[in-house]
C-alpha cells in the first residue's frame, strides 16, 4: 500500500509540473520565420508589378506543358526514375520514424519467463520458474519526448519536400532535354537543306572550273565549306543520340528513340508576336505573383524552414536533458517451486525512479551548445536561400526578356541574309559577283538560321527556369 502511495505521489508531482511555466517553456511550439521581402525579385526596371492572381507557379506541370508527347514522357520518368523512387522511400522511412516517436508516450511491456534446476550436495533436484510481466513508462515531464516527436515530424516534412524537389527537377530536366531534341531536329533540317543547296552550288562551281571560267581555288573554298556542313550534320546527329541517351537514363531504361513533336508545335505560356506572327515569350504577359505569396511555396524555402523547425525542437530536447528523467516501473507474475500445475505465489512490484544528471563529462552541455549553433546556422542559410530564390527569378525574367527582344532581330536578320544570298548568287551567275561573296552569304545565312533556332530554345529554357524558380513543377 505504501508503494502505491509513493507512485501516486510521483504522478501527482508530474501533473503539477504540467502547470508550471518551465513545463510550458520546454514544450513551446516552433514559430515559422519564413519572411519573404517584398523586393525579393530585385529592382530591375523590367520588373515593376507582380500580378497577384494566376501566378505561373500555380500551374501544374500538365497545364504548363501541353505537348501530349512531352506530358507522356514526363509521366514515364516520374514513374520509373530511380532518384524519385529513392526519395519516396526516404519519405516512408521518415514516416516510420515519426510513428515510433509517437509511440514513445506509451509504456513498454516485456515478458521474460525463466526457470532453474538446483541441487545441494547431490541431493534432490529443486525446480522453480518465474513468469514476470514487466512494464516501463517514461514520464514526459520536461518535454523531451514531445520535442523528439516534433523533430521527427519536421524530418518527415523535409523528406516530403525533398521528394517535391526531385520531382520538380525531373520535370524541368525532361522538358529541357525534350526541347533540346526539338532544337537539334530543327537545326538538322536547316543543315540538311543547306547541304542540298551547297552541293548544287559546288557542282555549279566545278562546271565553271572545268569550262575555265573560275580558278580551282574557288572550287576548293566551296568544297571546304560544304564539307564543314557535312561535319555539322554528323555532330548534330551525334548530339541527338546523346540527348536521347540522357532521357533514357532518366527513364531508368536502355538507350532508345524518344518520340517528340516537330519544332515550334510545343505550347508554353506565350504571347503572339505582332511583328513576325510567331509566338514568343514576353515577361509582360507572364504573371509571376507577389514574392511573399509565391516564393514561400518554393520547395527549397519550405525545406529550409522545416530544417529550422527540426533544429528548434532538437535544441528543446537537448535542453530537457539537463532536467531529471522520471520512470515508472511495474512487475506482475507468479513463481512456483513445485511444477507448473499450481501457480504458486503471485509476484507484484511497483516503483518509480528519478534520474538527475550531475556530471556527464560535459556531454549534455556540449550537445545543447551544438544544437543551438546548428539552429543559428540554419537561420542564416534560410536567409541565403530566400536571396538565391529571388535572384533565380530575376535571372529567369531577364533571360525571357532578352530572348524576346532578340527574336525579332534574328528573324529579320535571316530574311535579309536570305535575300542577300539569292541576290549574290544571281549576280555570280551573270558574272557580276565572285565566289567569295556567294560563300560569305551562304555561311552568314546558315549561322543566322542556327542562331535564330538557338534563341528560341533559350527562350523556352528561360520560361521553364522561371516556372521552376517560382515553385512550379511540384504538382
Q: Which residues does each predicted region cover?
A:
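Intrinsically disordered, glycine/charged-rich N-terminal periplasmic/extracytoplasmic linker segments
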Residues: 65-112, 127, 134, 138, ...
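Amphipathic alpha-helical coiled-coil segments
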Residues: 86-101, 166, 172-190, 200, ...
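Transmembrane beta-barrel architecture of outer-membrane proteins
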Residues: 70-72, 128-132, 176, 221, ...
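Periplasmic alpha-helical coiled-coil/stalk elements that build and connect Gram-negative outer-membrane
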Residues: 154, 161-290, 399, 423, ...
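Metallo-beta-lactamase
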Residues: 236, 299-300, 378, 455
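Membrane-embedded beta-strand positions in outer-membrane beta-barrel channels/transporters
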Residues: 74, 132-134, 178, 291, ...
